[in-house]
Structures are given as C-alpha cells and as structure tokens.
Amino acid sequence: MDIGDYRREYMSQGLDRDELLDDPFKQFEHWFQQANDADIQDANAFSLATTDLEVGPSIRTVLLKLFDENGFVFFTNYNSRKSQQIKAYPQVAMLFPWLPLNRQVKVEGRCEKISSAASLKYFATRPRGSQIGAWCSDQSEVIESRSFLEQKYREAAEKFKSGSIPLPSSWGGYRIVPARIEFWQGRENRLHDRFQYT
C-alpha cells in the first residue's frame, strides 16, 4: 500500500529559544501540563527504546509515573525482556508523542533501578486489582492460555484476600537519568523547531 500522500500541514505556533525555560525539567513540566490540559489521552504514555545483542533495538509503550530534577520514573516487572535489556545495556531513549499539539519530547540517558522503598510507596497507591496482577503476571513469558493467567489471578486474589498486599520482589521502578532532552515543535512547510538540552 502506497501511503505517500498521507500527510497534513503543521500550523502550530513556533517555538523560540527565548521562550524556553533554563531548566529542562521545568520545560517538560510546562509542556506536560499543556498536554494534560488539552485532554490528550494518556499524556503520560511514552515509547521506551532499549536494545540487546540478540535482536537489536526494541520499543514499547510505558506510562510515566513520576518526574523531577532527578529524572523520569516508570514501573515494570524486573523479569521482563525490557528489564533484562536495561540490565545489560542501561542506555535507553524515551519519546512522548503529543501529536494533537504537534509536539514531541525525546529523552536519552541512563536507566537505573529505584529503591525498594520508593517502589513500595508507589505500589501501595495502585488499585488492589493491579497489585494482585503484579503477583501473577510473568511478563514477556509464554503462557499456555488466557485461562491459565486468570486462574493465577484468582489464586493470588485468594492468597491476599485480607490485609495489604506486599510488593513482589520481581516488580518495581526505574529512573531514566537524562543526558539529552529534546523538545520538538512541528511547523508549516516542515521547517520544524527543535531544541536540545545537554
């Protein structure tokens, strides 16, 4: 299928250097708030790129749960493929595609585990069903059927039917510490604005 004529013109207001904040994290916060105010669905969703020697680059969508001057935090299963890739090659990239605003933010840097205490703090805020799911989902592993997974969920729900649910040792957070943050604004005639913090 030839989709060469599938295009639209970007008519956004430009991005001038004088308008950018000195602190890239503050600039990200400003753009993130604008994306949120624009009712962009899952404005905290980003594409996370990792790599390994076996197949090379790999990418998937992940949800941002915290950001501050120390970096960008997301949570996942530590036994997942992405976690194994991060362990071997901690240099990663993330991309926020805020397409309705003709914007994207790209972050490149080093990914590192956060503390168990910090992971527990977030885990405790998750819905109970999601907490149970963290105990029974062997991410990136082949399972025999959907019913097998649902049975594991029922068993975990029964096991933790009373009281608080502990943090699984196989689940927790990562922080991406940026080396570069790039802000991109689409412009007409493909003369886009792009500014990079290093």
Predicted feature residues:
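Binding-site signature for planar aromatic cofactors or substrates
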Residues: 1-198
